[in-house]
A protein has these predicted regions:
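Pyridoxal 5′-phosphate
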Residues: 1-170
Length: 170
């Protein structure tokens, strides 16, 4: 099959006790195809591998729940969802604690600072916070309320409905 996705039945025979890491994209920037990250994660972890997900293309279209996916690491960039050019990385605490950090000896060993190689880009972090505030505003404008997670769900629902309406015209 040429689905341009990672097919579970084709991946499974490739996983074994020598597999250390499965790195996959959540969505393709070329085809728009979306991988079943939750199923692929379970399969890889069942073989003893860690899972890294590149969600750059997906994060602008759908809300991500890393706990539901079960992945060990996930990365995206806010520039894909109206924010600044900044890398955002999620990692399970036990995985992050087990990784060696390449840093100066005087730098903190505490998470998340142990992976910072210099002064944080405060202006980019402020831009990211502005993006998140925009999402909350958008949710409120479309009649959504609730806690922060519910506001993000509402914002993504509104953006998805708008994308769908635009796509219908194609």
């Amino acid at each position: 099959r040429d689905t341009w996705r990672v097919e579970p039945e084709l991946l499974e025979p490739l996983l074994n006790d020598r597999t250390r890491l499965l790195a996959l994209n959540y969505a393709s920037n070329l085809t728009g195809g979306v991988n079943d990250v939750k199923a692929l994660t379970a399969m890889a972890q069942g073989a003893g591998a860690m899972v890294y997900v590149d969600a750059v293309q997906y994060a602008s279209h759908r809300l991500i729940d890393v706990k539901d996916l079960g992945c060990d690491f996930l990365a995206c960039s806010p520039y894909k969802f109206y924010g600044p050019h900044l890398g955002v990385v999620y990692g399970k605490r036990e995985r992050l604690e087990s990784l060696r950090a390449y840093k100066l000896r005087c730098a903190s060993n505490d998470l998340p600072f142990r992976f910072s190689l210099g002064t944080p880009a405060f202006e980019l972090i402020a831009g990211l916070m502005g993006t998140l505030e925009y999402f909350q505003w958008l949710a409120a404008e479309t009649g959504c309320g609730g806690d922060r997670r519910q506001l993000f769900e509402g914002a993504y629902a509104a953006m998805g409905a708008h994308e769908d309406a635009l796509s219908e015209q194609l």
